[in-house]
Regions:
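Serine-dependent carboxylesterase/thioesterase catalytic core
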Residues: 61, 69, 91-93, 101, ...
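Short aromatic-enriched loop/helix-cap "lid" or pocket-rim segments at secondary-structure transitions
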Residues: 75-76, 167-170, 200-205
Length: 243
């Protein structure tokens, strides 16, 4: 029994050590072959990016990742270059880590609580942007319906299956939507990829991005960008360079 307890302790310790406590700009590895999942291997919550030369701290940007299948070896890599791009604005940047296997509505509530806490602890902020991709775009869109504070929030939802998606668990509500009604305190933009160019959507019978946004804007991204297909993950970079 002691042998098994020792093995369990070592396993738990190794798992704990894989969660990074810092989030530093100069530790983000842009080359895919060198990527070590530094961005994603951390506790749930909102993490501030360190090492940014901030010249304006009155507003900032929160980024929200998507879903990762089991065994995916480069979790979070699609966000590295976009986050570096956002850091050039010289404003505070945060990364929102959540359990992508949890129900999206629960993750939206969690984002609400964490954002509320962030605002409370940073009284110098007068506005925030939140950029969500894929499942993160669903989470931020559900958040955009719920936000009831006077504090202004700008939401950018990128390549998100807003019309419907599989349940994340037996207790999760099945998302089947035709419409999102955005809160009056939120400025909302949906960025849609061209379905045929999006590896996550192109083989589906319908485009899960097709919904009506009541109180927001919906924009279709170009098919190509810099002589390459503008697909599911590259769409983040396009938006971060063009907003």
């Amino acid at each position: 029994m002691n042998k098994y307890l020792s093995l369990f302790f070592l396993f738990f310790l190794s798992c704990s050590e894989s969660d990074y406590s810092d989030l530093l700009l100069n530790k983000l590895k842009i080359n895919k072959s060198d990527y070590d999942e530094y961005l994603i291997n951390r506790s749930n919550g909102i993490h501030k990016l360190g090492g940014v030369n901030e010249t304006d701290s009155t507003w900032g940007i929160i980024t929200a990742h998507g879903y990762y299948p089991m065994g995916w070896s480069t979790k979070g890599f699609e966000w590295v270059s976009p986050i570096v791009e956002l850091s050039h604005r010289q404003i505070p940047v945060w990364f929102f880590k959540y359990d992508w296997n949890d129900c999206p509505e629960y993750s939206a509530d969690y984002l609400y609580r964490e954002t509320d806490k962030l605002i409370e602890n940073n009284s110098h902020l007068d506005s925030l942007w939140i950029i969500g991709h894929s499942l993160g775009g669903v989470v931020t869109s559900l958040f955009a319906e719920k936000w009831e504070q006077d504090f202004p929030i700008t939401i950018h939802s990128i390549a998100a299956p807003l019309a419907g998606m599989e349940r994340r668990g037996p207790d999760c509500e099945y998302i089947s939507r035709e419409k999102y009604k955005i809160s009056s305190s939120v400025s909302y933009t949906q960025w849609k990829t061209v379905k045929a160019q999006d590896g996550a959507f192109k083989n589906l019978k319908f485009d899960p991005q097709e919904v009506f946004i009541d109180g927001g804007t919906s924009i279709l991204l170009p098919e190509m960008w810099k002589n390459s297909r503008l697909g599911h993950n590259r769409s983040i970079q396009w938006v971060c360079e063009n907003i």
